């Protein structure tokens, strides 16, 4: 269980000029007294093709952290244009808001950012050299990608398990991999049978409209097979995600839920919101 839970992140100045600072109102809850500060960072992804253009816009130590719900403002400088390829200034990129405790990252929030000109004329016919003062950024604040990691806090008991617990009863269960392979074989056999029947009808009747009907049947079967396989693949992916719980406990999209709940924000309901010291 995480000692610190991120309740919400609100982008304060959005949209804004490209050269404006980034401002976030961050709300989180602390369940225990912490011995050290939290470190927040904002990173700008300068290029989708190479991480060498990533730049840390700012970092902030927050503490001491009182138990309860806390809120603070995180402000970061805009990216250094000299470290961004000219061809990558316009378009869609990503910013990453992360928080670490004692050097161990436990939460990451990613936002898409669209950088575009403030007029349709410049957008339709952009100049060879970008006009920075005419570029505006728009953060897709409604759909952040939030990833949480299990880490060790102040005690050894809080450290995540290095290995999954023993489950001897699982040895007697059916092998999902074998069952999946059997279903694949059954689907292929059914498809082959239908194709053979369609070819047989084609050779006996030889009429164009019968041929069209057989083709449609084949397409329907292929579609059904594709959908089943996709569903099964999704199930497998869900199982893989669960096995990777030690590395990333949760990877969800925070839409409307990214805003802190009323009962958390209400001082009379649970904990009083406290302004924490940043330095």
Curated annotation (Swiss-Prot):
Q: PANTHER family per the record?
A: ANTI-SILENCING PROTEIN 1, HISTONE CHAPERONE ASF1
The family this protein is said to belong to = Belongs to the ASF1 family.
GO CC terms for this protein? Answer: chromatin; chromosome, telomeric region; cytosol; H3 histone acetyltransferase complex; nucleus
As for subcellular location, the record says:
Nucleus
List where Basic and acidic residues composition bias occurs. 194-212
This molecule's function is given as: Histone chaperone that facilitates histone deposition and histone exchange and removal during nucleosome assembly and disassembly.
Assembly with partners or alone = Interacts with histone H3 and histone H4.
Question: Where do the record's region annotations for Disordered lie?
Answer: 151-279
Q: Which UniProt keywords apply?
A: Chaperone, Chromatin regulator, Coiled coil, Nucleus, Transcription, Transcription regulation
By what name is this protein known? Histone chaperone asf1
**Disulfide partners:** none
Q: Which organism is it from?
A: Emericella nidulans (strain FGSC A4 / ATCC 38163 / CBS 112.46 / NRRL 194 / M139)
Q: Which residues, by range, are in coiled-coil regions?
A: 182-246
Cite a single GO MF annotation.
acetyltransferase activator activity
Amino acid composition bias (Acidic residues), ranges on this chain: 168-187, 213-260
The Gene Ontology biological process terms listed for this entry are: cellular response to stress; DNA replication-dependent chromatin assembly; nucleosome assembly; nucleosome disassembly; positive regulation of transcription elongation by RNA polymerase II; protein modification process; silent mating-type cassette heterochromatin formation; subtelomeric heterochromatin formation
């Amino acid at each position: 269980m995480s000692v610190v839970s991120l309740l919400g992140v609100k982008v304060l100045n959005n949209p804004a000029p490209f050269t404006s600072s980034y401002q976030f109102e961050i709300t989180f809850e602390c369940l225990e007294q912490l011995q050290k500060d939290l470190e927040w960072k904002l990173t700008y992804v300068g290029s989708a093709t190479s991480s060498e253009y990533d730049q840390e816009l700012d970092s902030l130590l927050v503490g001491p952290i009182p138990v309860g719900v806390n809120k603070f403002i995180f402000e970061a400088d805009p990216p250094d244009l000299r470290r961004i390829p000219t061809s990558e200034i316009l378009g869609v990129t990503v910013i990453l808001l992360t928080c670490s405790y004692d050097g161990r990252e436990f939460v990451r929030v990613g936002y898409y950012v669209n950088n575009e000109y403030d007029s349709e004329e410049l957008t339709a016919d952009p100049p060879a050299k970008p006009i920075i003062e005419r570029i505006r950024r728009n953060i897709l604040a409604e759909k952040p990608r939030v990833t949480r990691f299990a880490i060790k806090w102040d005690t050894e008991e809080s450290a995540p398990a290095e290995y999954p617990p023993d489950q001897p009863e699982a040895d007697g269960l059916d092998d999902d991999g074998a069952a999946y392979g059997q279903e694949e074989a059954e689907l292929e056999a059914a498809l082959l049978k239908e194709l053979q029947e369609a070819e047989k009808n084609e050779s006996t009747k030889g009429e164009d409209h019968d041929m069209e009907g057989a083709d449609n049947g084949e397409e329907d079967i292929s579609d059904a097979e594709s959908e089943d396989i996709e569903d099964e693949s999704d199930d497998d992916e869900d199982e893989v995600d669960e096995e990777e719980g030690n590395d990333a406990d949760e990877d969800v999209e925070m839409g409307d839920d990214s805003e802190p709940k009323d009962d958390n924000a209400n001082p009379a309901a649970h904990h009083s919101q406290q302004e924490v010291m940043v330095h």
